[in-house]
Every structure is written in structure tokens, then in C-alpha cells.
């Protein structure tokens, strides 16, 4: 297989957005990655995630688990390429849970699958659920790693993105006043009352 140009695929699928964005953390950014735009094309999903499979194929994984929503398709595609079972966690009453009759065998080696890892919040919530059920989380696999800090486990990604993030009161885009702020993504903004 030839080397996968992840940035090219992100651009071709309109997943790498430029502008003025309000993130779920309440911070602002000039770029945003909307991986759902990549995942709508099965061939792009397979191609991009093949780069992640190359990094995790020797980890002796038993199970791939993706937090809903962003991790559902990612976990399925990683599981398909690895030949492993793929399931997902989801929120019920604002708490991450493993539902729908899915199970974790005690001692199972698990990779968490995400579309984008930024703060690691849903990853860590999922990790706690899986460890409470007796699983051993060996890392997180994702399309885009946007972290700027250690989340306490290895991250295996198709691409590492260094995207500037600003506190809302220090945002140069707000100060310029040229671009309206846009709220992308899917997580609710409870802290901001939106």
C-alpha cells in the first residue's frame, strides 16, 4: 500500500475547516476537524484508519470500543481491519455506559477508538467504564490527535494536529471582529447555556 496522505483526505472530504470556531470546552480556535466528513466515505475511512491499524496491530487487542457518537464508525472500521470485535459506549443520563448487551471479558485488552482526541474527556470516561468491568485499556486510537497534554495513555493517530486554541476573552479572531464564531461538533454546551 502506498503512503496515505491523511491531510489530503481531510481536505478532499471537507473535514479540515478554517474559520472561527467555538469548541465544546468553551475555547475558540481558527481550525476545526470534522471527522464525520471523512467517515461518510467508506474508502476514506478505511484508508485513513489503515495508518492507525499499522501502529496497533501488534498490541494483541481483544476488543475495540468507541464512545458514541464519534467513535462508533472508527471502532467498527478498526475492528474490521484488525479482525476484532467492535462495540461502543454511550451516554445515559449524562453518564458513559456500556449498554445494548455488550460485554467486556475480565482481562480483555482494549483499544479505545475515537474520531478526534482533544481534551481526552470522553476517552477517560470510557476508560473508567471499561476498567470497572475488568478490561485493560492499552491506549486510544484515533484519526486526529489534537491533544497538547498527556492524557495518561498512549495515543495512536493517523495525524497529529497542532491547532491553536484561545480562551474566549483572549481570542485574536474575536478582537479582529471579521469572522463570526461558529459552533461545530455534536457535544452540548451546557456551561455556556447554548
Curated annotation (Swiss-Prot):
Cofactor(s) the record lists: Mg(2+)
Pfam families: Pribosyltran (PF00156)
Residues reported to bind 5-phospho-alpha-D-ribose 1-diphosphate: 114-122
Sites where the protein binds orotate: 118, 146
GO annotation (BP), single: 'de novo' UMP biosynthetic process
Pathway it works in: Pyrimidine metabolism; UMP biosynthesis via de novo pathway; UMP from orotate: step 1/2
EC category: transferase
EC number: 2.4.2.10
Gene3D superfamilies attached to this UniProt entry: 3.40.50.2020
Domain of life: Bacteria
Protein function: Catalyzes the transfer of a ribosyl phosphate group from 5-phosphoribose 1-diphosphate to orotate, leading to the formation of orotidine monophosphate (OMP).
Family statement drawn from the similarity comment of this UniProt entry: Belongs to the purine/pyrimidine phosphoribosyltransferase family. PyrE subfamily.
NCBIfam families associated with the record: pyrE_Therm
Protein's name in the database: Orotate phosphoribosyltransferase
Native source species: Clostridioides difficile (strain 630)
Gene name, Swiss-Prot/TrEMBL: pyrE
